[in-house]
């Protein structure tokens, strides 16, 4: 299913999330199972299925990584259940540096400053990746779609690393 069509958007990485939320509420009102309480069982089931599609579409389009994955899946590139790893040596080196910095936080003289520095580093790198991804996703070239898939893999890794950093920060606050 093309969630961009469902929510009446042109496929694009940058979308108006406020408009997405508005259209989500409209679709929810239109397909909500309560509207079909007095209809046939088939209509009720169809309503439940449509509600699930609307919910999944909203969750997909509101999350930038899932939105990019969806855009790529519409072009025949499935990333959601893959195990392909990033082969970019520069990114792998950066990844190792971040992991080392993450491990060193507990022994740091100023753990919060180390955490803040990592968050800043993540934000800067993520902004670069996102800018490149936006450009690649607008291209119709097959090789650009493959490069976009690599950017998504990197962003997924960074999201996991960000979650780890948040857990370390939470543990230090406890």
Swiss-Prot record:
One of its GO terms (cellular component) is iron-sulfur cluster transfer complex. CDD domains: DnaJ. GO terms for biological process: [2Fe-2S] cluster assembly; protein complex oligomerization; protein folding. InterPro entries: DnaJ_domain (IPR001623), HscB (IPR004640), HscB_C_sf (IPR036386), HscB_oligo_C (IPR009073), J_dom_sf (IPR036869). GO terms for molecular function: ATPase activator activity; protein-folding chaperone binding. Pfam families: HSCB_C (PF07743). SMART domains: DnaJ. Keywords: Chaperone. Residues 2-74 form the J domain. NCBIfam families: hscB (TIGR00714), PRK05014.1 (NF003449). Co-chaperone involved in the maturation of iron-sulfur cluster-containing proteins. Seems to help targeting proteins to be folded toward HscA. Belongs to the HscB family. HAMAP family: HscB (MF_00682). Interacts with HscA and stimulates its ATPase activity. This is Co-chaperone protein HscB homolog.
């Amino acid at each position: 299913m093309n969630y961009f069509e469902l929510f009446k958007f042109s496929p694009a990485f940058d979308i108006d999330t406020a408009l997405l939320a508005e259209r989500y509420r409209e679709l929810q009102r239109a397909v909500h199972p309560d509207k079909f309480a007095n209809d046939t069982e088939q209509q009720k089931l169809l309503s439940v299925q449509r509600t699930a599609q609307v919910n999944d579409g909203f969750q997909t389009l509101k999350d930038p990584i899932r939105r990019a994955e969806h855009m790529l899946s519409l072009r025949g590139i499935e990333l959601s259940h893959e195990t392909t790893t990033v082969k970019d040596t520069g990114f792998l080196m950066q990844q190792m540096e971040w992991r080392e910095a993450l491990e060193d936080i507990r022994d740091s003289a100023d753990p919060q400053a180390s955490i803040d520095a990592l968050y800043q580093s993540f934000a800067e790198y993520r902004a670069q990746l996102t800018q490149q991804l936006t450009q690649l996703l607008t291209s119709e070239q097959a090789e650009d779609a493959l490069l976009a898939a690599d950017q998504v893999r990197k962003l997924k890794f960074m999201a996991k690393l960000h979650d780890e950093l948040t857990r370390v920060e939470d543990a230090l606050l406890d």
